[in-house]
Amino acid sequence: MEQGQKPKRDRTYYKNLLVFTVRVVAILAILLYFGVPIIDANSALHPPRFPIGDVSPADLGLEYEDVTLTTRDHLKLYGWYIPSTNGAAVVLVHAFSGNRTGTLYHAGLLAKHGYGALLYDTRTQGESEGEVYALGWEDYLDVEAAIDYLKQRAEVDPGKIAVLGLSAGAKASLYTATQDDSIAAVVVEGTRWRTFEDLLLDTEPKWYVWLPAEWLSWQFVEWKTGIRHPTPLREAVPRINTTPLLLIAADAELATSQAYSELTNGPATLWVRDEPGHQIDALFDEPEEYERRAIGFLNEWLD
């Protein structure tokens, strides 16, 4: 070979280069496949807090009281209570990464019909205490504290307390009903998965490829928080014997909501909304229909 002339590269060189490239791409793909869900799960452990600001039930012309709830695990939760005028009251549980203002208009509708409404910031959200959000696994403790508060109110009949939850709040509300048969009725919107086992209820093929990565992310949360993996809703819901359920579902929640409505041993009504994706806006999208269905449901079971 003459000086300055580049050496010739044979087939072996290019074959090795191809193998190396394929291996690098495969490793990167695996890291992305498992890494992205874990990164998402880790970021969800410490959600941002959104301030309440100057918003309050007074903006809707409602009288209210500031309340402080204490959970069984000694966290203080802060909220508002709009007194009942008909002897019944509803606990309102907002969605993840929000605060009590996310259920303010639901409270306004309830108050219009005489129902008391207890809105609070769930743990790690708004003004409430809590440092780690473990995918909502412990949020049922917040719902329990809210129910205990209402049972102490002189104007509330302890047998006429309902729970209304949105998205993550829906999961917490539904699970609480599996533990407390004193709840008179449950309205949940956007109810999806509490655990990986619940995710398997979702029959959409698009999820199949992500199942191993999702499973790993759930295990990561258990390891990171030290909080034991909870009972899946699919196992807990059959414990409901008498509490009536109203499940409101858009496309993304249809499979799970349908399953929960069939698994319960109590009365269940499923309102299927022809809306794409994950939705918790029924009150705003269909206000008259929401009022007819939700208030009608509560009137039936809390009368």
Label the predicted regions.
Residues Y175-G226, P238-I240, L283:
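Hydrolase active-site cap/lid region
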Residues G102, Y133-A154:
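Alpha/beta-hydrolase active-site loop
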Residues R72-P83:
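A short loop-to-beta-strand scaffold at the N-terminal edge of the catalytic core in hydrolase folds
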